[in-house]
Regions:
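Internal signal-anchor transmembrane helix that establishes type II topology
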Residues: 31-60
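Lumenal/extracellular ectodomains and adaptor appendage modules
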Residues: 57-491
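Disordered, charged N-terminal biogenesis/targeting segments of membrane/secreted proteins
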Residues: 1-34
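Short linear motifs in intrinsically disordered/low-complexity regions
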Residues: 5, 12, 16-18, 40, ...
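Residues in flexible loops and secondary-structure boundaries
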Residues: 18-24, 28-29, 48, 134, ...
Length: 491
C-alpha cells in the first residue's frame, strides 16, 4: 500500500498486527523447491537432457557444499559446464574439430559469486570429406532461464558472420538425478535412444487453451471511514466442486484451507483508493472443477479470525467461462514487469504448463495437498527455473571444404571450497562422436588476467585445464580450470 506520510509508513512497517503474522503462518504455499544449489541440479540434468539429441557426456564434476569463514557459513555456487555442438541430421562425411578458449582476463571484480565470469569462445571446424555439399542441422545447447536468456545466450557466428538462430526451450532440468554418472555405453543405449527431451523441445510451445471458470472480483471496497494504517481485509469463502478441482488466484494476498470443514478462503487487503489497487484483475480460477456457495466477508486485518469480523466490506463476483491461456495472457499483459522485458508470452505460457503440473494444478491426480496456488508464483517460477535452451541453425559445408562455427559466451564461474580455500572454476564438457564425428577436442586458458591457477596435488586430476591446449577425452567427465585472485605475496 502507498501512504501519504513518512510517519504512517514507519508505523505500518514497525507496528505489525499479530493477526497478520498468524495469517502468514497459516498460508499454504505451493510445493517448495530448494534453489540454493539449483545450478547443480541443472548441470546434472543436462546429462540426460542434451544427451538425448545424440551428444552425451558426464557433466557433473563439481562439488556441493561450502565452508566456514569469519563471516559464517559460505555456500558453494555451481554453474553448468560449456556444452558442445551437436547435429540433428545424418552427418556422414563430416568431421569436426573443436577448440575451446577460456579468457579470464575479462574477469569482473566484485563480491563473489555473482560478478565473476570470463569469456568462453567455443569454436568448431566442420570439414566435408565428400564431393557434394552437405547441410548440417546444428544445435548449440546451453543451460539458462527465461529471465536471463537475452543476456546469457551465446553469440553464434558461421565463417565470421553472425547467424540468426531458432530458439527451443526444453523442460525444467531440476528434477533429474543429481550427480549420476553414466558410462559411454550407458549413454548411447539409455540416453540417445529416442531423444525425448530435445524432441519435446522441438515440438514447440504447449497450448494452455484449457477451459476454466474464473470468478472476478468487482466493485469492492469499504463503506466506512478508515485510517491509512487500517489493514481492512476482504475475504472470499467457498466450497470446491469436483474431485480433482484445483484453484489458481491472482490479486489475493492470503489463502486458508479448513481441514475440518473443507472450506477455502482467499483474502486481500482493501486498497484505500483506485490508485493503490492492483493493475490486473483479481481472479479465483477453478481448474477441472468449479466453486459454489461463495460468501464475501470483511475483517479488521489479514488474520481473518472469528471475532475480528468487520461490517461495511462489500464486493461482487462475476463468473466468467474462459481458458487458462486467456487468463495468463491477460495477467502478463497487464503486469509491467513482463511487458518491460519483452518476454515471448507464448513461450512463457508454455513453460507455465510444466510448473502447473509440478504443483498438481494440472495432471488430474487426486492430490489432497497443494490444490491451490498463486498464478504470480507459477509464472515467476517459469521465468526463473533452468532449462536446456537450444539454438538451432543450418550450416552448409561445401564439397571438399570446411565451415567455421563459433559460440561466444559470458560464462559465470563456480565459487567453490577446497583444500586451498575458496576458488573459482570454469568447466568444459567433452562431446561424444555420436551426432558429429569429432576428430579432436582441445581446451585451454588464453588469459589468466589477475588470477592464478591452483592445482594442489591432493585435488589434481587429469582433467585440469591450463594455458596449454588439453585434449578432451569423452567419458571422463568435465574438464575445468581452477583459479583464484593472485595473492599479495606474488604481486
Amino acid at each position: 500500500m502507498r501512504y501519504d506520510s513518512g510517519i504512517a509508513l514507519f508505523d505500518a512497517v514497525t507496528d505489525i498486527d499479530e493477526a497478520l503474522i498468524e495469517q502468514a503462518e497459516s498460508y499454504v504455499f505451493p510445493k517448495a523447491k530448494q534453489r540454493l544449489f539449483r545450478h547443480i541440479g541443472a548441470a546434472a540434468a543436462a546429462l540426460v537432457a542434451v544427451a538425448g539429441i545424440g551428444t552425451a557426456w558426464a557433466l557433473f564434476g563439481a562439488q556441493n557444499g561450502g565452508m566456514l569463514n569469519s563471516g559464517g557459513y559460505e555456500p558453494d555456487y555451481v554453474y553448468p559446464a560449456v556444452l558442445p555442438l551437436a547435429a540433428l541430421n545424418n552427418t556422414a562425411g563430416i568431421t569436426t574439430e573443436r577448440e575451446t578458449d577460456i579468457d579470464l582476463g575479462s574477469f569482473l571484480t566484485g563480491q563473489p559469486p555473482f560478478y565473476w565470469c570470463g569469456e568462453v569462445t567455443d569454436s568448431y571446424t566442420l570439414t566435408n570429406t565428400t564431393d557434394g555439399d552437405i547441410t548440417v542441422q546444428t544445435v548449440y545447447p546451453y543451460i539458462g532461464n527465461l529471465a536471463g536468456m537475452n543476456d546469457e545466450m551465446p553469440a553464434i557466428t558461421v565463417d565470421g558472420y553472425a547467424v540468426r538462430t531458432e530458439i527451443f526451450v526444453g523442460d525444467e532440468v531440476w528434477d533429474a538425478d543429481i550427480g549420476e554418472m553414466f558410462t559411454e555405453e550407458q549413454q548411447r543405449d539409455k540416453l540417445t535412444a529416442d531423444g525425448e527431451y530435445l524432441q519435446k523441445a522441438l515440438a514447440g510451445n504447449i497450448s494452455l487453451d484449457i477451459p476454466v471458470i474464473a470468478y472476478r472480483m468487482t466493485d469492492y471496497g469499504y463503506s466506512g471511514d478508515r485510517t491509512p494504517n487500517d489493514p481492512y481485509t476482504l475475504a472470499v469463502r467457498y466450497d470446491l466442486v469436483g474431485h480433482n478441482a484445483r484453484i489458481l488466484t491472482t490479486g489475493f494476498d492470503g489463502m486458508h484451507y479448513d481441514n475440518d470443514t473443507g472450506l477455502y478462503r482467499h483474502s486481500f487487503f482493501l486498497p484505500h483508493n483506485e490508485y493503490e489497487d492492483y493493475p490486473y484483475p483479481r481472479y479465483i480460477i477453478a481448474v477441472s472443477g468449479d466453486i459454489t456457495n461463495i460468501r464475501i466477508e470483511g475483517y479488521k486485518n489479514g488474520g481473518c479470525h472469528p471475532g475480528e469480523e468487520l461490517g461495511g466490506v462489500y464486493g461482487s463476483v462475476e463468473r466468467v467461462e474462459t481458458t487458462l491461456s486467456a487468463i495468463i495472457r491477460e495477467y502478463m499483459e497487464k503486469t509491467e514487469y513482463y511487458n518491460e522485458r519483452g518476454y515471448d508470452l507464448d513461450l512463457l505460457m508454455s513453460k507455465c504448463d510444466g510448473v502447473l503440473r509440478q504443483h498438481y494444478i494440472l495432471g488430474g491426480d487426486d492430490v489432497q495437498t497443494y490444490r491451490a496456488a498463486r498464478l504470480s508464483e507459477i509464472i515467476g517460477e517459469a521465468v526463473s527455473e533452468d532449462h536446456v535452451i537450444y539454438q538451432r541453425f543450418d550450416v552448409t559445408v561445401p564439397a571438399g571444404g570446411s565451415a567455421d562455427i563459433s559460440a561466444v559466451t559470458r560464462k559465470k564461474a563456480d565459487w567453490l571450497s577446497g583444500n586451498e580455500g575458496r576458488y573459482y572454476a570454469v568447466k568444459v564438457a567433452p562431446a561424444y562422436s555420436i551426432s558429429l564425428d569429432y576428430t579432436s577436442q582441445t581446451a585451454c586458458v588464453s588469459d589468466l588476467g589477475h588470477l592464478e591457477m591452483i592445482t594442489p596435488e591432493q585435488d589434481y586430476t587429469d582433467r585440469e585445464l591450463g594455458t596449454e591446449p588439453v585434449s578432451l577425452e569423452p567419458g571422463t567427465g568435465n574438464y575445468e580450470v581452477k583459479v583464484k585472485p593472485v595473492s599479495k605475496t606474488n604481486n
